[in-house]
A protein has these predicted regions:
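Walker B motif beta-strand of ABC-family P-loop ATPases
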Residues: 166
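Extended interfacial segments that mediate partner engagement and assembly in macromolecular machines
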Residues: 54-109
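Interdomain "pre-motor" coupling segment immediately N-terminal to P-loop NTPase/helicase cores
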Residues: 19-70
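Conserved P-loop
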Residues: 85-163, 210-213
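Short hinge/gating elements
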Residues: 8-11, 27-31, 76, 104, ...
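Charged, compositionally biased N-terminal leader segments and the immediate start
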Residues: 1-21
């Protein structure tokens, strides 16, 4: 191919936003010629490579937008250390069918039992399926909601949260909430209810959630929404982190 058509082709591919196509067309032409493949195979191969790369970039963007504190997969979780956790259910949830049904997940257990790891793993699985995910702690979310309310940007933040396929709220119960903070959190969970799915991790059993929200009425209404369509992951026992550290030293 002479220089002028090459320049024109690269220009067109750039305009069409086909970077993989642009980077691979010359190499794949040589390979297809060596393999005696026709132009249909050549174009099909380039299109497949473009789609694979496009999906990879999309997943990368989803993971970045989720704001995970760290990237952890379910494959790296040692279920043998936490026998109380239902592994078949957890792995089935990683298929993300529950998101299509707008169901919720609540992981309950003492501090250090791996709840955040499981939430991160489920969040990563959702990103890998092209779903929009947002991760936050309960304390950080309440802080953001109060700040947004003070700056008259509350509706914008609520809209961002309700547009997600999955919202993950970690560490509910670690910090008591103010009355206004509890009401704002209740409001955003109510808005997300049946629009998308919610994952909540908590170190407190349900009957102690009143300590967090400070109101039996608010707690009851919140649990009514969250547990309407819910999968409960029980994670009881000795600290997962302690067991995992001990196992690694052996």
């Amino acid at each position: 191919m002479t220089e002028a058509p090459q320049i024109l082709l690269r220009h067109h591919l750039k305009q069409l936003r086909l970077p993989t196509f642009q980077g691979e067309y010359a190499k794949q032409a040589q390979l297809c010629a060596a393999e005696n493949k026709d132009h249909i195979h050549y174009l099909a191969r380039l299109c497949e490579m473009e789609l694979i790369e496009r999906e990879r970039r999309m997943i990368e963007r989803r993971i970045k937008a989720a704001k995970f504190p760290s990237t952890k997969s379910l494959d790296s979780f040692d279920f043998k250390i936490m026998p109380s956790l239902n592994k078949p259910l957890t792995m089935d949830l990683a298929r993300c069918d529950y998101v299509d049904r707008r169901e919720n997940i609540i992981a309950l257990g003492p501090s250090g039992t791996g709840k955040t790891h499981i939430a991160l793993g489920l969040g990563l699985a959702a990103c890998q399926r092209g779903l929009k995910v947002r991760f936050t702690t309960a304390a950080a979310l309440v802080h953001d909601l109060i700040e947004a309310q003070d700056e008259r940007k509350l509706q914008r933040l609520q809209k961002q949260l309700t547009s997600q396929n999955l919202v993950i709220i970690d560490e509910l119960g670690f910090v008591p909430l103010s009355k206004s903070g509890a009401e704002l959190l209740f409001e955003v969970i109510s808005q997300c209810y049946e629009r998308g799915s919610i994952i909540i991790t908590s170190n407190l059993p349900f009957d102690e959630w009143t300590k967090v929200f400070g109101s039996e009425r608010l707690t009851g209404a919140l649990l009514d929404r969250l547990t309407h369509h819910v999968h409960i992951l029980e994670m009881n026992g000795e600290s997962y982190r302690l067991k995992h550290s001990r196992k690694n030293r052996q």
